[in-house]
């Protein structure tokens, strides 16, 4: 998968097109990610210890990974990702600026 938890991304298609956010969780086996503030759904929750009131809560639902594009750390624009070997480690880099994404 070309994105990881903590990456800043932009949604490139769907009802939330153009929104930016940070990846909160990634599910590589399902090819889906949860992005902060994107794809908000209303969920009916039973009363529980954490939520004694119950009722309807809004939370982020997973979206397909092909709908998000990482943001270039230098320019802040969406960019494609490439891979290269640096000091014997495989790292991701932004195709637009050449900036390395992995610390």
Curated annotation (Swiss-Prot):
One of two assembly initiator proteins, it binds directly to the 5'-end of the 23S rRNA, where it nucleates assembly of the 50S subunit. Gene3D superfamilies: 2.30.30.30. Belongs to the universal ribosomal protein uL24 family. The gene is rplX. GO terms for cellular component: ribonucleoprotein complex; ribosome. Part of the 50S ribosomal subunit. This is Large ribosomal subunit protein uL24. GO terms for biological process: translation.
